[in-house]
Each structure stands twice: as C-alpha cells, then as structure tokens.
Amino acid sequence: MGFRLRNVPLLSRVGADRADHLRTDLDAALEGWAEAVVLRVDERSQVMVVDEQVVLSPAAELGDSPPGNGVFLGRLPDGRHAWAVRAPLQAPDGVPARVIDPRRAGVPFDDVSAQLVTCALALLNWHDAAGFSPADGSPTRPIRGGWARRNLLTGHEEFPRVDPAVICLVHDGHDRAVLARQVVWPPRLFSLLAGFVEAGESFETCVAREIYEEIGLDVTDVTYLGSQPWPFPRSLMVGFHALADPEQEFSFNDGEIAEAAWFTRDEVCEALAHGDWGSDSTSRLLLPGSISIAREIIESWAFHA
C-alpha cells in the first residue's frame, strides 16, 4: 500500500523569504535594522508565543546595529528583516505570552513562526558549538549574517553542519504498522523507528540497516515520503515507509528499543484521537506531537483511504 504525506511537515513550512542575498550586504542589513524584529531564544532554547505566533521584539531595543551574536533569518512578508539572538525572553506588555520548548510544543506554529524558530535554533545551536575551528583550534567569528564563521588565523570559512537521519513507518502493506518505544522513553510513548545515516550510506540502505539493528525485521520497498529539519541540535529527518512481514519475529539487537509491536489502523487512529505525548490521556498508546514529522507520517498512513 502506497501513500503520501497529507501535509507539509510543520518545521518544513515556508512563511518568510530567507533573502540570502542580504546576508553579505552590510549596508542593507544596517538600513533595515531600525524596522527589524528579533526572535529571542533563551539558554534552554525556549521561545515565547502568543496563540500560534512566536513573539518578535523590536530590534532597536538591542542597539543601533545587529549584535555580534545575531543571526539573520530573512525577510517577513511585510518586508521587515528578522533576526535571532540567544538572550533572556521578554514578554510584550499587556499580552498573555507563554514560554514553550519548541521540541515539545503541542500547539502548531503558523508557517512564518515555524520557519523562524527552526532556522534560529539550527543556527544558534551551531554557533554555540563552533567558537573554535575543528581543523586547528583557532578562534572563529560569525560572518554572512551568522550563516558562516571565519577562522581568525587562516581566514577559512566554515558553515553550519547538518546531520541527516532517517525515520520510517514499517507496515505490512495492508492494515498494520510497527510502532516502537525507546528504552529511555516512559511507558506508553511510542513512535517510528529512526537513526542517523552513516558515512558512505544511502538513505534507503540506512533505513534497512537501522530497522534490522533495532527490531530485527527485514524491510523491502523503501519509499521516500518527505523531510523535515530537526534543529535539536542539527538534524535533517528524512521520512520513508517500508514493507515488512508480520510473521517475522522481533529481536532487539542494539539495546535502544524496549518494545515494539504491530498495531492495526483502528488502534492507531484511536491513539491519534487521544492527543500526543503531552496528553493526560490514559490510553495505552501515545504518539508524537505535531512538531515531529513522525506524527505527519503516522497520520498520513492511518487516514489513507
């Protein structure tokens, strides 16, 4: 049974112009700063939201020009420039804002907010770990609006690292799919199987290897579905579905999976109706929230006609 994603995964949605040509145009950056807005991300990678929109504060509050730790996110639909900084959160006056951890957010962002938060986290997390060159240990400094760093000794430019990982829904081609729980997860929390791509490995080969290593099943017909950035701290999740035989026994070979089982479509639909991992439901099966491509893949399979 083939199926497609019903919707673009939340963190893959585009609501703003990345405006990469402005990253090296210092004059344009300075000219736009007076009307620009800033997304604050605190040390715990939390942000503030009002309804489905992330809180953006006036850039001028930070000074007359972009700070050294600022990263340029792009241009909003109304033309204003958007930046991000690692800084304490500030709620706007008279607005009921709340602090959220994007990784655990249960309420979807609008498209603009999703793009800004994803981009901000990916860049800021990289800068936190990239103060020194991996080649010679020399200090580096941000350039290109925060989209690169330059080695102060050699002048070599370094760019954000992205770690690709696969995530796959294994099904029988009919009415059953495999869901699994990692050892570190509490009881009742299940999701899809996932793992990082190794050097010299294709996505499809990685899917087959990871599933065999984690639960001992052989898969065929590995089919691409879609992808989603996962900036926690720097992954790109590449989604697939694949076929397996329900008669083949599970074996938990690498110690990462505590349990796995075949669930019927009706069981999965019932679990989806009970919310997600953050729900207070007593359901025996709780599934990931909308922030993850796992949810979109599961829903797309469950509701496929």
Regions found by a protein language model. Give the residues of each.
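Active-site-adjacent beta-strand/loop module that shapes the phosphate/pyrophosphate-binding cleft
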Residues: 228-251
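Cys/His-rich short segments
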Residues: 118-169
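Short glycine/proline-enriched turns and hinge-like loops at secondary-structure junctions
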Residues: 145, 162-163, 191, 234-235, ...
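The catalytic Nudix box helix
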Residues: 191-225, 240
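N-terminal strand-loop-strand
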Residues: 149-191, 196, 218-219, 244
